[in-house]
């Protein structure tokens, strides 16, 4: 499931220039954004949709999903993030 999660985030990064890098191992994945404000917006708006994302190093998002996460949960998060990123271009 970790590879699936990372692949979905890489697909998101390829679609949105605000995402500079996706890195990690297993389910512990980080996403670096081009600006601090993008990270702040993603954290806040994702929380309102029910997804908790940790922000580190000002513009890096750290994902630490529970071990019981399912593909549908990952897909939901990526869909929410996609909509948010479209809105902040």
Regions from the language model: what does each represent?
Residues 1-89:
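Conserved N-terminal phosphate-binding loop of PLP-dependent enzymes in the Aspartate aminotransferase
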């Amino acid at each position: 499931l970790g590879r699936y999660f990372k692949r979905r985030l890489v697909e998101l990064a390829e679609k949105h220039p605000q995402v500079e890098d996706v890195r990690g191992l297993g389910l512990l994945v980080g996403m670096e954004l081009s600006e601090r404000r993008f990270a702040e917006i993603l954290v806040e708006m994702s929380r309102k949709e029910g997804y908790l994302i940790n922000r580190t190093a000002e513009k890096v998002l750290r994902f630490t999903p529970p071990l019981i996460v399912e593909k549908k949960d990952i897909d939901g998060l990526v869909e929410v993030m996609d909509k948010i990123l479209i809105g902040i271009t």
